[in-house]
């Protein structure tokens, strides 16, 4: 993708986690595939939002809006706050699920660009309305078009239809083509990303084409990518390699190596979700384990958080019982402020480090450089991390215990074989177990989705009543008087009676500018267990 500097990039690193871009999802409905896609899509969306609406700590997803495009484009859900709004999002998903029995026709080619233009207009009006009350206004959004049509055909349609549209407020425009076949899933199935053709350079925003399997798990993984920190204003971590960490030539003392890295979570901390962690009360900060390395890296606004490598270790030289907290992934930075040569050199050095560590069977022990404030004269405590290489272009980082944290313990080695009778009983029991080659977390469910959904299901008669009334259809036709967007949707063609409905529609839609009571309460209420 082309690296542009047209959108606002002034966000401080302290806001990286909490100021994620709004999301606009446009579902391009077409028969006959919609009948197969709809159940999987709706289940994946419900599972995703049960997590996204429940997460404590910094907000990972600010606003969300949903459009559908079939024989016309329609705003099913205007931009709303995600946190604390599960009931409203669930009603939207229920409405989306009903579309599978309405008889969908192949949408006209002009409707997708119209839906994007309509969503942009709604976003701009919402942003300008909320600019005075928001701590930091939203200046850009990400748009996803979900379709079962050939992806390249949709990309070409968007390139043609959007060439005269101002897309400076679009941070990313992606087309996700849902395929009918289900490919074999690995540990973390990820969508296949393809750049669009050269003609997309005429647009002010690049179009990214991805393919997505038509199953619930793949769609969940696709939507959960929205929870990642997507800011590229500044690299998160500086990994400092001292001469003692890797034995380079003697002249390396004059050329210290600093690898610039971005930080990525491997999974969500259970402490960020209500009713998890096996019922044990959390004595840590409500933000959970994210308050360690991830939070330190985000709060280092003046400069990236530094990890100073102290020494190398043999991979068998550390006991797993000494590591704690959430693991994190280090990868070469994609910071937009670095020039291409520096980015390429940094990635090559990172690749070489992974290769050398694997070849030598080494780990790295690193010290987190504390953030020393001028007004604090005492030396702050620091944390130590063990860094493990992988066969991909990533490093695994885990906290490791230090002397101050250790408790006495003596664990003698097994000195002799166990009694023969006990050995036979245990061996027979073990032989009855299923043996798997690997652990795949995507095949193991903990009923967390249903638990979180039930926790959100509180009686709200007014909302359910309005949802049910919106879902009614008359004579198999769509309701033409249903307008819930923050702006009046763009017409496909001029209609004589349209002007008569504009005033009423504008009044009805103005309420969408204001957050609901639950949204306001959620913003003001501090996170707690």
UniProtKB/Swiss-Prot annotation:
<dbReference type="GO" id="GO:0016020">
    <property type="term" value="C:membrane"/>
</dbReference>
<comment type="function">
    <text>Required for meiosis I progression during spermatogenesis.</text>
</comment>
<keyword id="KW-0221">Differentiation</keyword>
<dbReference type="GO" id="GO:0042802">
    <property type="term" value="F:identical protein binding"/>
</dbReference>
<feature type="region of interest" description="Disordered">
    <location>
        <begin position="180"/>
        <end position="201"/>
    </location>
</feature>
<keyword id="KW-0963">Cytoplasm</keyword>
<keyword id="KW-0744">Spermatogenesis</keyword>
<keyword id="KW-0597">Phosphoprotein</keyword>
<dbReference type="GO" id="GO:0051308">
    <property type="term" value="P:male meiosis chromosome separation"/>
</dbReference>
<feature type="modified residue" description="Phosphoserine">
    <location>
        <position position="516"/>
    </location>
</feature>
<dbReference type="GO" id="GO:0006396">
    <property type="term" value="P:RNA processing"/>
</dbReference>
<dbReference type="GO" id="GO:0006325">
    <property type="term" value="P:chromatin organization"/>
</dbReference>
<dbReference type="GO" id="GO:0007127">
    <property type="term" value="P:meiosis I"/>
</dbReference>
<dbReference type="GO" id="GO:0005737">
    <property type="term" value="C:cytoplasm"/>
</dbReference>
<dbReference type="GO" id="GO:0007283">
    <property type="term" value="P:spermatogenesis"/>
</dbReference>
<feature type="region of interest" description="Disordered">
    <location>
        <begin position="504"/>
        <end position="529"/>
    </location>
</feature>
<dbReference type="InterPro" id="IPR033587">
    <property type="entry name" value="M1AP"/>
</dbReference>
<feature type="compositionally biased region" description="Polar residues">
    <location>
        <begin position="188"/>
        <end position="200"/>
    </location>
</feature>
<dbReference type="GO" id="GO:0007292">
    <property type="term" value="P:female gamete generation"/>
</dbReference>
<protein>
    <recommendedName>
        <fullName>Meiosis 1 arrest protein</fullName>
    </recommendedName>
</protein>
<dbReference type="GO" id="GO:0030154">
    <property type="term" value="P:cell differentiation"/>
</dbReference>
């Amino acid at each position: 993708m082309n690296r542009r500097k047209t959108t606002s990039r002034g966000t401080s690193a302290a806001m990286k986690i909490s100021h994620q871009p709004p999301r606009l999802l446009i579902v391009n409905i077409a028969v006959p595939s919609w009948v197969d896609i709809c159940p999987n899509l709706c289940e994946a969306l419900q599972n995703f939002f049960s997590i996204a609406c429940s997460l404590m700590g910094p907000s990972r997803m600010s606003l969300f809006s949903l459009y559908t495009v079939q024989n016309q484009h329609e705003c099913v859900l205007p931009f709303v706050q995600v946190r604390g709004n599960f009931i409203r999002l669930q009603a939207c998903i229920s409405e989306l699920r009903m579309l599978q029995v309405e008889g969908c026709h192949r949408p006209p080619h002009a409707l997708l660009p119209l839906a994007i233009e309509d969503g942009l207009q709604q976003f701009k009006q919402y942003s300008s309305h909320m600019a005075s009350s928001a701590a930091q206004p939203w200046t850009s959004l990400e748009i996803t078009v979900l379709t079962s049509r050939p992806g390249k055909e949709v990309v070409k349609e968007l390139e043609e239809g959007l060439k005269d549209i101002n897309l400076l407020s679009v941070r990313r425009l992606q087309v996700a083509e849902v395929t009918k076949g289900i490919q074999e899933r690995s540990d973390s199935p990820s969508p296949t990303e393809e750049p669009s053709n050269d003609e997309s350079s005429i647009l002010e925003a690049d179009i990214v084409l991805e393919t997505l399997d038509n199953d619930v798990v793949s769609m969940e993984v696709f939507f959960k990518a929205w929870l990642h920190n997507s800011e590229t204003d500044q690299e998160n971590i500086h990994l400092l390699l001292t001469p003692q960490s890797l034995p380079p030539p003697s002249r390396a003392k004059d050329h210290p190596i600093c690898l610039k890295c971005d930080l990525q979570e491997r999974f969500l901390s259970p402490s960020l979700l209500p009713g998890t962690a096996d019922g044990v009360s959390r004595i840590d900060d409500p933000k959970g384990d994210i308050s360690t390395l991830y939070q330190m890296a985000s709060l280092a606004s003046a400069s990236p958080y530094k990890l100073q490598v102290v020494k190398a270790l043999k991979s068998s030289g550390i006991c797993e019982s000494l590591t704690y907290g959430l693991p994190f992934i280090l990868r070469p930075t994609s910071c937009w402020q670095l020039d291409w040569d520096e980015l390429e050199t940094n990635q090559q050095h990172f690749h070489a480090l992974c290769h050398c560590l694997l070849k030598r069977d080494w780990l790295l022990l690193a010290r987190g450089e504390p953030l020393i404030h001028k007004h604090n004269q005492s030396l702050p405590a620091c944390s130590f991390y063990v860094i493990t290489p992988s066969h991909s272009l990533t490093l695994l980082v885990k906290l490791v215990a230090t002397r101050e944290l250790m408790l006495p313990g003596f664990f003698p080695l097994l000195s002799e074989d166990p009694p023969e009778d006990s050995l036979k009983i245990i061996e027979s029991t073990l032989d009855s177990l299923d043996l798997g080659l690997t652990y795949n977390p995507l095949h193991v469910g903990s009923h967390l989705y249903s638990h979180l959904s039930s926790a959100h299901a509180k009686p709200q008669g007014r909302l359910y009543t309005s949802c049910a009334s919106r879902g009614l259809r008359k004579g198999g036709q769509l309701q033409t008087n249903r307008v819930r967007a923050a702006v009046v949707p763009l017409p496909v063609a001029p209609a004589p009676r349209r002007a008569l409905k504009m005033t009423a529609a504008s009044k009805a839609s103005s309420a969408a500018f204001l957050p609901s009571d639950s949204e306001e309460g959620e913003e003001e209420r501090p996170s707690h267990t």
